[in-house]
Amino acid sequence: SNERIEIPEGVTRALVVTAHPDDVDFGAGGTVMALVKAGVTVTFCICTDGDAGGFDDSTDRSEIPAIRRAEQVAAAAVYGVTDVRFLGYKDGYPEPSHDVQRDIVRVMRQVQPQLVLTQSPERNWERLPSSHPDHMAAGEATARALYPAVRNPFAYPELRNNEGLEAWTV
């Protein structure tokens, strides 16, 4: 498409939250490239290691997380993204739980983005593969983290009290 991506004024930091390594590349690669070209510092937050991905039985499954992480870091470098964070949840198991929300809030408070991109938390029956349960969980956990948790200094007080991470409004 030749559509131009408009970067909102004042955006200098963006956070992209997805379920799996490679979700950024399939879902938001062009947007990430436009952000980086506009001078925005982009951070990736990947909820799982993608350990259940692929259909190759010849690879030792215990090696998959390291492979998927390395692939994502290499792909990020192509865009000019150097900050890639992995939450380490098991592929196929994320829920929009308080643990996942807290971990996303932590990253948001560390990065302090003005823009957050994530996957849709809604099921799309017309495009079922886009409605992977992990994608929906990452999207819902991110939405809950965005409001109200990240801006509420009393949400996940351990982040403030133990890690010095103050509330942040995206």
Residue map of PLM features:
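Active-site rim/loop-helix segments in enzyme catalytic domains that contact anionic ligands
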Residues: 1-112
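Metal-dependent de-N-acetylase/amidase catalytic core
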Residues: 1-17, 95-170
